[in-house]
Amino acid sequence: MSEQDKKQAAIKAAQAAADAVREAQAALAEEGRLLFKKSWIFIRGVPSMKFLPPEGPVEIAFAGRSNVGKSSLINALVGKKGLARTSNTPGRTQELNYFVPDGYSGENGDLPPLALVDMPGYGFAEAPKAQVDAWTRLVFDYLRGRTTLKRVYVLIDARHGIKKNDAEVLDLLDKAAVSYQIVLTKIDKIKPAGVPRLLEETHKLTYKRAACFPGIIATSSEKGQGLDDLRAAIALLLKEY
């Protein structure tokens, strides 16, 4: 085979590999779209560990500072305004709130493939200190001890980056060996020119962490940015279980 033929063969192989990657990405995007096209419902709020539902479907949780946009992201993800209650008052979510696709009885193996868990925010709340401390214990106990929890999406406000209490939660997840991935919220609130730098800075702060799943997903609940990427990431996760 001549050198020219070798080059052409290498180019064709690279093109075939790129096509295969694109096809796989498109398939995941479609799986994510179909999963979240279903009607989703709220099933329970959990004020303490003893009220957790029986372990069954894969659970993914959304963690983050108060007012980072967890509830808004869940609503945008499932395409259902008002499913997760939102508020401009930090600390509005006071329980572990469970959401699942509708149409499953929950009995005799008729379980949904996935449960979304909206967690109380950390860092600030307009509530008595004792109540805030109780929420904090609930969050940490859940993160450490729930065997069906397969991924935590740690939401970071794009305008502020990773703060001290975010890093403390990442430390906890690393120590507990709970897989997590960073999701930037409100990406539309910063200038587009600043996004690459933000992604680079966030990557530098997280890529060496033991339990951090690679890849940072930048989202906007208001504009819909990054939602397809997040749905595809969840679809990929479900393939493992």
Curated annotation (Swiss-Prot):
Signal peptide: none annotated. One of its GO terms (cellular component) is cytosol. GTP binds at residues 64-71, 91-95, 118-121, 185-188, 219-221. Keywords: Cell cycle, Cell division, GTP-binding, Magnesium, Metal-binding, Nucleotide-binding, Septation. GO terms for molecular function: GTP binding; metal ion binding. It comes from the Bacteria. Residues 56-240 form the EngB-type G domain. Mg(2+) binds at S71, T93. It holds the Pfam family MMR_HSR1. Its cofactor is Mg(2+). Gene3D superfamilies: P-loop containing nucleotide triphosphate hydrolases. Necessary for normal cell division and for the maintenance of normal septation. Belongs to the TRAFAC class TrmE-Era-EngA-EngB-Septin-like GTPase superfamily. EngB GTPase family. This is Probable GTP-binding protein EngB. It comes from Brucella abortus (strain 2308).
